[in-house]
Amino acid sequence: MSQFSLSQCVSMTAEQQEQSLAEINLRLEMMDAHQRVNWALENLPGEFVLSSSFGIQAAVCLHLVTQEYPDIPVILTDTGYLFPETYQFIDKLTTQLKLNLQVFSAEHSPAWQEARYGKLWEQGVEGIERYNQINKVEPMNRALKNLRAQSWFAGLRRQQSESRSKLPVLAVQRGVFKILPIIDWDNRRVHQYLTKHGLEYHPLWEQGYLSVGDIHTTQKWEPGMSEEQTRFFGLKRECGLHEN
């Protein structure tokens, strides 16, 4: 499929987009992660961006994509409630990989939000969704607009959750193309990549965390829990960034 016809996808319905991208996704499924990144850079429209939560295995996609596009803007939506270890990890990877880090946050500070709304994350699913809209979704939408993004790399993997288990390599979200180069990787493959390239897991990995987000909605893994249950008190998995 040509870049011109890909560009037409943005104005299609979700069903039309899926049908239009079906053939190319079959081809992308046969490629390895490096080939997917290079295919995207050659065939998808710029500007390109890469998003990262700087979670447990974030170094993989950050390294993979920046090896091919060193100066790609790396979007972080900072809620102000990340773990201290996450901020330290961000600083370390930014220096190590020479990242072009672009930080976007909510219009109002965490303290102001708490004064206005209370602790939204303690107000059930509705409160969590409102919190995510304010602190994740709106800043990401603003980032995509300000950076004039047309193609967006992200490090999601099918193994991470049921909600991600059927995601394609290439899709359209928020009016831009979204490509997931390591979507089919399992934990073993992630570990092999990190080891091969001298990269580290998030510091909290060693303390039993499988997934890391905000300090108040992230739980350490306990026997019998799925990875999904360690986030948002098990009420939901996604923060809204990767949902239409």
Curated annotation (Swiss-Prot):
One of its GO terms (biological process) is sulfate assimilation, phosphoadenylyl sulfate reduction by phosphoadenylyl-sulfate reductase (thioredoxin). CDD domains: PAPS_reductase. Disulfide bonds: none annotated. Keywords: Cytoplasm, Oxidoreductase. InterPro entries: PAPS/APS_Rdtase, PAPS_reduct_dom, PAPS_reductase_CysH, Rossmann-like_a/b/a_fold. GO terms for cellular component: cytoplasm. Coiled coil: none annotated. It is an enzyme of class 1 (oxidoreductase). Its EC number is 1.8.4.8. It catalyses: [thioredoxin]-disulfide + sulfite + adenosine 3',5'-bisphosphate + 2 H(+) = [thioredoxin]-dithiol + 3'-phosphoadenylyl sulfate. The keyword Oxidoreductase applies. The active site is at residue 239. It comes from the Bacteria. It is found in: Cytoplasm. Belongs to the PAPS reductase family. CysH subfamily. Catalyzes the formation of sulfite from phosphoadenosine 5'-phosphosulfate (PAPS) using thioredoxin as an electron donor. NCBIfam families: cysH (TIGR00434), PAPS_reductase (TIGR02057), PRK02090.1 (NF002537). This is Phosphoadenosine 5'-phosphosulfate reductase.
